[in-house]
Regions:
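Short acidic-capped amphipathic helix/loop micro-motif used as an active-site/signal-coupling element
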Residues: 48-53, 77, 81, 160, ...
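Short, conserved glycine- and acidic-residue-centered signature motifs
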Residues: 73, 142, 195, 199
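Active-site core of bacterial EAL-family cyclic-dinucleotide phosphodiesterase domains
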Residues: 2-62, 243-244
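Catalytic core of bacterial c-di-GMP phosphodiesterases, primarily the EAL and HD-GYP domains
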Residues: 70-141
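Surface-exposed amphipathic alpha-helices with a cationic face
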Residues: 117, 143-155, 200-207, 228
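Structural preference for beta-strand elements that scaffold enzyme active sites
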Residues: 21-23, 39-41, 92-96, 125-129, ...
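Short glycine-centered, acidic/aromatic-flanked micro-motifs in structured strand/loop junctions
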Residues: 28, 44, 97-99, 130-132, ...
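EAL-family c-di-GMP phosphodiesterase catalytic domain
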Residues: 1-5, 36, 46, 131-136, ...
């Protein structure tokens, strides 16, 4: 039964890629100062023939089980660039990024660079967002991968600061252009003194090292307003827009 399940999962995963079922969902990121859209985070989704939408977690789980995470990582990156260009999503484009999925930074970079060049996308507008929990196993490798991307003009964000004790170590080693403050700190920010103190210090620290901060996972205006007061540069969350596939964005 286990072998049968693995075989079925493999067929399902191959169909996702071959049949054009993979798509992006884009969530706005807004300036804290005026609430205007500064860019979008590209999130991976899959649209099944019956119309149901699969989350990134479901897709990634299958990719890991089948040892296809590298293939998926490259495909997701190209897809985000192509859809952002096709649907004229202006501003910064944040693309989730898994350094551990990359064996050869130079080859991977060349693929991404070629797509950006073909689409005439300014690499300075593309931000590769390192998911901290995905990258804790090899700090040196992550730094090497990101250094290669920076040399071509791409920028780097560190995601989920505040979700693990090692976050400050990664902040020091990777020196990101943007830092995302985890929803564990932003949820209930207006009501919890301790969270406000931590977010204020993180915002100050990031300013000192030249990184701009994004409060993610915001669910109400009260928390968003406090984040602005504490010096956060950008806001992301449901008050400013849910993740939407391109067709939904065109209809809204």
């Amino acid at each position: 039964l286990r072998r049968l399940a693995a075989a079925l999962e493999s067929i399902w995963f191959e169909e996702l890629q071959a049949d054009g079922q993979l798509t992006g969902a884009f969530q706005p990121i807004v300036n804290a100062s005026d609430r205007r859209t500064a860019g979008y985070e590209a999130l991976l989704r899959a649209r099944r023939p019956d119309g149901t939408i699969l989350s990134a977690a479901e897709i990634l789980r299958a990719a890991r089980a089948l040892d296809r995470i590298t293939t998926l990582d490259v495909r997701a990156r190209i897809l985000a660039l192509e859809q952002a260009k096709k649907h004229e999503l202006h501003g910064l484009l944040f693309i989730n990024f898994t350094p551990s999925a990359i064996d050869d930074p130079t080859t991977c970079l060349q693929t991404t660079w070629a797509v950006a060049e073909r689409l005439r996308i300014d690499p300075g507008k593309v931000v590769f967002e390192v998911i901290e929990s995905e990258s804790l196993t090899n700090l040196r490798h992550a730094a090497d991968v990101l250094a290669a991307y920076r040399q071509r003009g791409f920028r780097v964000a560190l995601d989920e600061i505040g979700s693990a004790h090692s976050g400050l170590v990664w902040l020091s080693a990777l020196q990101p252009d943007f830092v995302k403050i985890n929803r564990q700190l932003t949820a209930g920010l207006a009501a919890v003194v301790t969270k406000r103190a931590i977010v204020a210090k993180l915002a100050e620290l990031c300013r000192q090292i030249g990184a701009r901060t994004i409060a993610e996972g915001l669910e109400d205006e009260a928390d968003a307003s406090v984040a602005v007061e504490l010096g956060v540069d950008f806001l992301q969350g449901y008050p400013f827009g849910h993740p939407q596939i391109p067709e939904q964005m065109s209809d809204s």
